[in-house]
Amino acid sequence: MNKLLRLIVDNKADKPRPFNLARNGDAASLYIYDVISADWGVSALSVIEAINQAGDVQTLNVHLNSPGGDVFEGRAIMAALAAFRGKTVAHIDSLCASAATSIALACNEIRMAEGAFFMIHNASGFAWGDKTELRNTADVLEKIEGAIVNDYTSRTGKPEQEIRDKMQAETWFTAQEALDYGFVDSI
């Protein structure tokens, strides 16, 4: 089992965690400090409920410290943030890896703390079944990867193959490297 997956499994909660939304005038903050999953950790539904609780705030601060998780939950959170009527600001407080990167990229602005990390890698998953089912799973992973590559190239302006090479290598960016590469706006 790869190290990131082991970290996710070892730190999973028994069920999705509820959010405490912190409001301060025209701004609200939510903290995605866990694995992204419909079954445990942070679910898309819990984030959507928190966004709805924010009401008509002008700025939504999204604090991230997540090893990632379920790509589809991450993309649902991404869509919810993109639909938010105000400004969204991602704050990468420690770790923004895998599916959590989609959440950061959905925000209008991305700030990263000194000492934090941003990790990208190829889509991965589990498969069970005969050879046809395994091949079908690989085909789906390639489609998922294509969507993620598109997100990363749109954000950074880097060529597709360069992004694919970084994902293949499972690249960990420091805050300065993520800034230089175009993933974040400021440190």
Question: What do these predicted regions represent?
Answer:
Residues 1-101, 107-187:
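N-terminal organellar transit peptides
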